[in-house]
């Protein structure tokens, strides 16, 4: 039995999501149509609203429904003087869930990748440079991913910050909590050794 073109289109559309292949998309579509049509309509409505109403914070570039996100609009966070640079909005969420950081963020929406046509301008580094030159920041915390591109991006931003005599730090990378050394790759292990602390 062949599927209708609308079903096929819907399954294909769902595959734009990360980790969703043909089988997962098929299960989702058949579940929503067979068991949860009300949920499907609610999902459709919320997706449409989100796409139309959620934009980027004018200061840090994370997702928000307002001109400024709740963090940038918080005077206590702004007075802290620390700014944490991350690659994606989901990284802000991950750090916020630790409840350890009380400064502001700057979201790059990617990393430097000249081969893909992603340079400083595409990452909004002119906006970051303007913020750093304002004299309101005492420390830049680099929290880009520990990839070649992430490290290159971190280095580029560190050089920017040093022009304004701002302290620059990099989040530690190493062995995960609960991890076993035999399963840790050599690059991660070398980062762990070079970033070791007194016990």
UniProtKB/Swiss-Prot annotation:
Entry keywords, A to Z: DNA damage, DNA recombination, DNA repair, Metal-binding, Zinc, Zinc-finger
Keyword Ion transport appears in the UniProt entry: no
Chain intervals annotated as zinc finger (C4-type): 57-72
Entry keyword Metal-binding: yes
InterPro entries per the UniProt record, alphabetical: DNA_Rcmb_RecR (IPR000093), Rcmb_RecR (IPR023627), Rcmb_RecR_Znf (IPR015967), TOPRIM_dom (IPR006171), TOPRIM_RecR (IPR034137)
GO molecular function: DNA binding; zinc ion binding
Pfam family name, one: RecR_HhH
Database matches in SMART domains: TOPRIM
GO biological process, one term: DNA recombination
Domain Toprim: 81-176
Top-level taxon of the source organism: Bacteria
Function statement: May play a role in DNA repair. It seems to be involved in an RecBC-independent recombinational process of DNA repair. It may act with RecF and RecO.
Family: Belongs to the RecR family.
Stated name of the protein: Recombination protein RecR
Natural source organism: Psychromonas ingrahamii (strain DSM 17664 / CCUG 51855 / 37)
């Amino acid at each position: 039995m062949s599927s209708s073109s609308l079903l096929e289109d819907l399954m294909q559309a769902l595959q734009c999501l990360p980790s969703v292949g043909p089988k997962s998309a098929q299960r989702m579509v058949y579940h929503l149509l067979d068991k949860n049509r009300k949920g499907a309509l609610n999902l459709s409505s919320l997706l449409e609203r989100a796409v139309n109403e959620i934009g980027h914070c004018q200061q840090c570039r994370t997702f928000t429904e307002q001109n400024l996100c709740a963090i940038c609009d918080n005077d206590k966070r702004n007075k802290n003087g620390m700014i944490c640079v991350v690659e994606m909005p989901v990284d802000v969420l991950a750090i916020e869930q630790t409840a350890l950081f009380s400064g502001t963020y700057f979201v790059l929406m990617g990393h430097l990748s000249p081969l893909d046509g992603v340079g400083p301008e595409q990452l909004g580094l002119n906006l970051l440079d303007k913020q750093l030159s304002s004299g309101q920041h005492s420390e830049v915390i680099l929290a880009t991913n520990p990839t070649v591109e992430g490290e290159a991006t971190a280095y580029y931003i560190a050089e920017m910050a040093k022009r304004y005599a701002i302290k620059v730090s990099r989040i530690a990378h190493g062995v995960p909590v609960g991890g076993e050394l035999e399963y840790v790759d050599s690059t991660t292990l070398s980062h762990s050794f070079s970033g070791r602390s007194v016990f």
